[in-house]
Design a protein with these regions (language model features):
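ATP/NTP phosphate-donor binding region
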Residues: 24-106, 288, 312
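Short Gly/Thr/Asp-enriched flexible loops that form oxyanion-binding sites at enzyme active sites
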Residues: 118-140, 284-292
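Boundary at the C-terminal end of the N-terminal hydrophobic targeting segment
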Residues: 18-23
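C-terminal non-catalytic interaction/assembly regions of soluble proteins
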Residues: 279-361
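Short, acidic/small-residue loops that bind anionic groups at enzyme active sites
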Residues: 129-160, 166-170, 296-308
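Accessory alpha-helical/coil subdomains and C-terminal extensions
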Residues: 30, 36-37, 61-72, 189-271, ...
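Internal gly/pro-rich beta-alpha loop/helix module
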Residues: 144-217
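Bacterial N-terminal signal peptides that target proteins for export
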Residues: 1-8
Length: 361
């Protein structure tokens, strides 16, 4: 088939699935939920039902995913949009800005929308979720969902995950809970959740703070809320931002190479997050490498944040690091500390203001 024919076939297939999804909607009295599809394993196809590791992600469009779970129409009037189509390792900061703006526009244009679901690959799902937790300006729920097995696999987890995500987005109890991840019948908060296993279905965990709730056969149940600022209480506005400040992560290990710090500064990084050992401890090699950075004028030197590579626990303020200007990341993982620092730098370079932001978010 010629390339033009392939494109026409893809368009026709998308239209057919969209029509099928619309035809299944039994009532306009159901909550309206938007599904924004971005690709990932949940939309992947393998060569056989046992192909659990070798498959092509993003092979199914969002309309096809929704049409494949007709039970969805019992719970919501679903509108589907394919906003991007990439594997989550290839998601970009521009994609994040596009998704955040689209969600904010959906909420602003239609007060009847109950919530938004985003289908997403699991590799970077927690990062996208936390970015949206800081940039969606509405109390209505945003739920990210993925799968550990492709759609063609035996016992694929994607269909039930998608159904449960839509049920959560449609639930009145989900308002004000911030951005969430729903997988394996469990509801997690974007700030605390992380992927903990490469293949197991129960991969998403908030190891110390626990689930927000569960999605069971009878109802969506919540047992706690995140008290940190998010969504409708967030100060971050990306409506007119064209690019996010450059921030990178330096991973600490025995005799780590200090040249990495120098290279990031030379490349123009506006911030550096340390995935430090233990309770956010830098080695003497790293401290030495930071001396030229600390000698730079405050207006031009990168903002420095201490997080921990351990995966659990707080990184707290210490006099020696405070004197060096390193800001503690509290319980944020290195990758989430990077996201918060990028957004903080869109507003200020004042160290005290950035400390406040890391305390409140």
């Amino acid at each position: 088939m010629k390339p033009g024919g392939l494109l026409l076939a893809a368009i026709a297939m998308s239209a057919a699935y969209a029509a099928a999804a619309g035809a299944q909607t039994p009532s306009t009295n159901l909550p309206v939920v938007w599904v924004l599809s971005t690709g990932g394993t949940i939309s992947g196809r393998g060569a056989s039902p046992t192909a659990l590791a070798e498959y092509k992600s993003g092979s199914m469009l969002g309309a096809e995913l929704v049409a494949g779970v007709p039970e969805i129409t019992q719970f919501a009037d679903v509108k589907v949009e394919q906003i991007v189509n990439v594997g989550s390792p290839d998601i970009t900061l521009d994609n994040w800005l596009t998704i955040a703006r689209r969600i904010n526009r959906i909420f602003a244009e239609d007060p009847k929308v109950a919530g938004v679901v985003i289908t997403h690959g699991t590799s970077t799902l927690e990062e996208t979720a936390y970015f949206l937790n800081l940039t969606v300006r509405d109390e209505r729920p945003v739920v990210l969902v993925g799968a550990q097995r492709p759609a063609t696999a035996i016992s694929a987890d994607g269909p039930l995950n998608l159904l449960n995500a839509i049920r959560t987005a449609a639930a009145p109890e989900a308002r004000g809970k911030g951005v969430m991840i729903v997988m394996n019948d469990e509801i997690n908060a974007a700030r605390e959740v992380t992927k903990t296993n490469t293949y197991r279905l129960e991969t998403f965990r908030a190891p110390e703070l626990g689930f927000l709730g569960y999605v069971d056969a009878d109802r969506v149940s919540f047992y706690r809320s995140s008290t940190k600022r998010h969504t409708s209480r967030s100060e971050f506005d990306v409506s007119s931002i064209t690019a996010l400040p450059k921030v990178d992560i330096v991973y600490s290990y025995v005799e780590s190479n200090p040249a990495m710090i120098q290279a990031l500064v030379a490349s123009g990084d506006r911030g550096i997050v340390f995935a430090a050992t233990g309770a956010g401890t830098l080695s003497s090699f790293e401290k030495q490498a930071l001396q030229p950075v600390l000698a730079m004028p405050q207006a031009t030197r990168p903002v420095l944040v201490r997080s921990s590579r351990t995966g659990n626990g707080r990184v707290i303020a210490r006099e020696d690091y405070d004197a060096m200007g390193l800001i503690p990341a509290d319980t944020l993982s290195p990758q989430k500390a990077r996201i918060l620092l990028m957004l903080a730098l869109t507003r200020t370079r004042d160290p005290n203001e950035i400390k406040r932001i890391f305390t409140e978010y």
